[in-house]
Amino acid sequence: MRVLIKNGIVVNADGQAKQDLLIESGIVRQLGTDISPQLPCEEIDASGCYVFPGGVDVHTHFNIDVGIARSCDDFFTGTRAAACGGTTTIIDHMGFGPNGCRLRHQLEVYRGYAAHKAVIDYSFHGVIQHINHAILDEIPMMVEEGLSSFKLYLTYQYKLNDDEVLQALRRLHESGALTTVHPENDAAIASKRAEFIAAGLTAPRYHALSRPLECEAEAIARMINLAQIAGNAPLYIVHLSNGLGLDYLRLARANHQPVWVETCPQYLLLDERSYDTEDGMKFILSPPLRNVREQDKLWCGISDGAIDVVATDHCTFSMAQRLQISKGDFSRCPNGLPGVENRMQLLFSSGVMTGRISPERFVELTSAMPARLFGLWPQKGLLAPGSDGDVVIIDPRQSQQIQHRHLHDNADYSPWEGFTCQGAIVRTLSRGETIFCDGTFTGKAGRGRFLRRKPFVPPVL
């Protein structure tokens, strides 16, 4: 299979140029002006469009069972939506397994979930839900098998205490793995939640009030300090929602500590006023949506380089599930938002087209830095000879309004309903194969490949 993309503006994190791009057998073979292939190939005219590396979303939750519900997107519908939004690689956060289970148990379960369903290439983050000698001994073996990142939780059922966190940080660091963490102070949240429930205050807005930004920021500061105690272990903070936590991360970075951070479109573009709408339960996620002042602080981090990655935390529960389970009580509502299809378009529109970020910075946030941090570079996140032919073509001249009925996930709503975006995803290629074109999904279940990721190597801070 040969594909020649002509006349587009090819953008990588380190620059852009109007040039052609030749893909053969799923691999980028040549970039240059006026490429004339010696053999027949499919030609795609990208005149007036940006040609970006396919998106790498390093934070999804497909087919996750949270105890009270299972998310409504599996690895087919979830990766289909990703493909239609210009994302060609996902790294899924595996959910909690049975009490006391080994790391391998969840890996085998999740490989079974994805094997015959994934449309695009995929990998997984391990999840450490308890610490014992067997788990610590298993970590190096998992890294050898291509899982080079693991997630810890400071809240929820399988939260770790500080001693367990230190043990995990040390062993992961020794084994060549990156520690990722969901940072919220569980005790403070439980106290606030109990206070509201006792007073009969169960409307959606009390979800946000029960998880104030200080709960998140305190946990971020604690993790930074624990990582330092654990021998300057590398640390990745997921789904940052506030500026105080970002200040702590800036300070750590100024002290040359190896810390990185992601945020998500919902924290950049949605705010806490959503909880006071008639459909406020649609927006229950943790950490919760914040106020506009916090949005502005995050945008500063996007613009000045303090934030490294924009991912989605895609975790879809239908409105029907939310209403049936919660019965109007925020504390019973399953957490999470859809968004894997909208990430690239939303950030392009609100970032590149407004002048907040350059096209190169867009690549850094959506594909290049995720690939570097999580052991996929230069196979992913780059358009250069030898890299995978993963491409998203965006036409900046087109304007689109997001409507759920046109999306490809399995949710029954979109938090982005009615958002108007400047710039449209017109084509997605995965390893040279067109899997989305002009509004139509053309991929197939099972074509995605499991990616064995390289051990963690820190990018230059």
From Swiss-Prot:
Binding-site positions, a divalent metal cation 1: H59, H61, K151, D313
Post-translational modifications reported in the UniProt record: Carboxylation allows a single lysine to coordinate two divalent metal cations.
GO terms for biological process, alphabetical: pyrimidine nucleobase catabolic process
In-chain residues carrying the UniProt-annotated modification N6-carboxylysine: K151
EC annotation from Swiss-Prot or TrEMBL: 3.5.2.-
Cofactor: a divalent metal cation
InterPro entries: Amidohydro-rel, D_phenylhydantoinase, Hydantoinase/dihydroPyrase, Metal-dep_hydrolase_composite, Metal_Hydrolase, Metallo-dep_Hydrolases_sf
Catalysis performed (reactions): D-5-phenylhydantoin + H2O = N-carbamoyl-D-phenylglycine + H(+)
Keyword Metal-binding among UniProt keywords: yes
Domain of life: Bacteria
Pfam families, alphabetized: Amidohydro_1
Binding annotation for substrate: Y156, S286, N335
Residues annotated to bind a divalent metal cation 2: K151, H182, H239
Keyword S-adenosyl-L-methionine attached: no
Function: Catalyzes the stereospecific hydrolysis of the cyclic amide bond of D-hydantoin derivatives with an aromatic side chains at the 5'-position. Has no activity on dihydropyrimidines. The physiological function is unknown.
The protein's assembly and partners: Homotetramer.
NCBIfam families: D-hydantoinase
Record's protein name: D-phenylhydantoinase
Record organism: Escherichia coli O6:H1 (strain CFT073 / ATCC 700928 / UPEC)
Gene this protein is translated from: hyuA
